[in-house]
């Protein structure tokens, strides 16, 4: 879970269409890993139509903003960006040129026509379930329409999205995201996901394996399976029956070239025996698990409709660590949910101490329009939220630094991902997701090398290569 913004690198081949030099697209991505994946798939779809990616909106013919709706100020962040683009569009029009502006993602799904009302300079609004219709929607825009595509599609969008070209995948790196599940049926009272991403939908094993094999053939070594509630994945298996995520992981581990597997984000209620067995038996499944709990108070967990108690979460963590003692945990926390008392917050602090997280995200509660939480009374004062968040983040930061320090002296395998900032350096990824910096000018990106951790940096590890 993150509020980071990224942009899609200009990785699309230019020789595939006679129009390739005349249409350029800039994609700005806000929010989670699934939005990054979605932006890549939209870029792949546009590449098939002759669009070339650019790393700046200044020379783009099409600007797509792929939005996130998790945080309170997500919409205002969007409209601020659209205000800047309006000036750019007006300047283009004064020179007799065009700029097409599109809004995608969860804000697009949530607000739809309202975006066109507030920002008339927008030409296209498209929700996550209709990205396969993007080329057709743009054709309608070129015909003079203002297009809003936010209906939930009957057809399977993944069946209609073009596969990425091998060269494009190579340029994206040796680690890749692969969406296997979308939507959520849990309806936590604070969360907009069921309303913006819809009910849970699982891709078939056939689809997932085909995409994973294409990624492996293009040099991908590490796959992270994505879903709003990824461990609720239950797709049609190769034998015709319904599989769970544990079975899927065992199948993906058989693909040549795939050396590492991860998945995110999970719900405690959906950690079943098969998935725990995968953590025990699969060497490719990395010992790092993002398992949000949100609160350590049973009373608040019930108000959030989390469907589990704090002690059930702790027992689950114990089960996982019993089969994988080196497992590191990350989580999400919300402070200041309506009705949260001092004791409720202290229960959260105690749970954090009991789990001892390697990393966690924490936020002040902000009501999201249309969710049950927005209708709750007994709101916590902002000053109290601020104080609680500060205390929680101090504890989580101390745990994070202690976890990093515990790596010093340890030997581990590291997947090399890119050259470092300094000459002769490489940057890799540890099994626990931490970046690892190594003085190494002999190995290549995609190699897995054995190292010893000698010190820590800011959110990174420093290592020496072992013979």
UniProtKB/Swiss-Prot annotation:
Give the enzyme's EC designation. 2.8.4.3
One matching Pfam family, short form? TRAM
Alphabetical list of Gene3D superfamilies matching this protein: Methylthiotransferase, N-terminal domain, tm_1862 like domain
Q: Which GO terms describe its molecular function?
A: 4 iron, 4 sulfur cluster binding; metal ion binding; N6-isopentenyladenosine methylthiotransferase activity
- Annotated region (Disordered), positions in chain: 1-20
Q: Where in this chain does the record put each Radical SAM core domain?
A: 170-402
Q: Which family does it belong to?
A: Belongs to the methylthiotransferase family. MiaB subfamily.
Q: What does this protein do?
A: Catalyzes the methylthiolation of N6-(dimethylallyl)adenosine (i(6)A), leading to the formation of 2-methylthio-N6-(dimethylallyl)adenosine (ms(2)i(6)A) at position 37 in tRNAs that read codons beginning with uridine.
Can you name this protein? tRNA-2-methylthio-N(6)-dimethylallyladenosine synthase
Source organism per UniProt: Brucella suis (strain ATCC 23445 / NCTC 10510)
Q: What is the lineage of its organism?
A: Bacteria, Pseudomonadati, Pseudomonadota, Alphaproteobacteria, Hyphomicrobiales
């Amino acid at each position: 879970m993150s509020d980071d913004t990224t942009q899609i690198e200009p990785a699309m081949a230019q020789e595939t269409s006679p129009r390739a030099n005349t249409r350029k697209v800039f994609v700005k991505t806000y929010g989670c890993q699934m939005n990054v994946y979605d932006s890549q798939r939209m870029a792949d779809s546009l590449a098939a139509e002759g669009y070339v990616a650019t790393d700046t909106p200044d020379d783009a013919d099409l600007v797509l903003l792929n939005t996130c709706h998790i945080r309170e100020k997500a919409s205002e962040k969007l409209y601020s960006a659209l205000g800047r683009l309006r000036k750019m569009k007006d300047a283009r029009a004064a020179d007799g040129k065009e700029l097409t502006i599109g809004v995608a993602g969860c804000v697009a799904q949530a607000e739809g026509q309202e975006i066109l009302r507030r920002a008339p300079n927008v030409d296209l609004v498209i929700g996550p379930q209709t990205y396969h219709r993007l080329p057709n929607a743009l054709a309608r825009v070129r015909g003079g329409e203002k297009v809003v595509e936010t209906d939930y599609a009957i057809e399977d969008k993944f069946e209609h999205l073009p596969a990425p070209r091998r060269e494009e995948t190579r340029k994206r790196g040796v680690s890749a995201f692969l969406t296997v599940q979308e939507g959520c049926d849990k309806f936590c009272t604070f969360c907009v996901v069921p309303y913006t991403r819809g009910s849970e939908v699982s891709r078939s094993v056939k689809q997932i394996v085909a995409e994973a094999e294409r990624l492996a053939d293009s040099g991908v070594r590490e796959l992270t399976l994505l879903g709003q509630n990824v461990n609720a994945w239950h797709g049609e298996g190769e034998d015709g029956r319904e599989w769970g995520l544990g079975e899927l992981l065992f199948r993906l581990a058989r693909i040549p070239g795939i050396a590492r597997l991860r998945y995110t984000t999970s719900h405690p209620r959906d950690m079943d025996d098969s998935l725990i067995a995968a953590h025990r038996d699969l060497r490719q499944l990395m010992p790092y698990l993002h398992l949000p709990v949100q609160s350590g108070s049973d009373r608040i967990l019930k108000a959030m409709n989390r469907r589990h108690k704090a002690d059930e979460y702790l027992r689950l963590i114990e089960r996982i660590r019993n089969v994988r003692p080196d497992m590191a945990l990350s989580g999400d926390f919300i402070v200041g949910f309506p009705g949260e008392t001092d004791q409720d917050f202290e229960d959260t602090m105690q749970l954090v101490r009991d789990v001892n997280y390697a990393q966690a995200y924490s936020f002040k509660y902000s009501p999201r329009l249309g969710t049950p939480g927005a209708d709750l009374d007994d709101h916590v004062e902002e000053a109290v939220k601020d104080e609680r968040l500060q205390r929680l983040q101090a504890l989580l930061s101390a745990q994070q630094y202690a976890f990093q320090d515990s790596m010093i002296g340890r030997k581990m395998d590291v997947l090399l991902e890119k050259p470092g900032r300094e000459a002769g350096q490489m940057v890799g990824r540890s099994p626990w997701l931490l970046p690892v910096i190594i003085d190494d000018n002999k190995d290549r990106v995609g190699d897995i090398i054995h190292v010893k951790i000698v010190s820590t940096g800011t959110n990174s590890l420093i290592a020496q290569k072992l013979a």
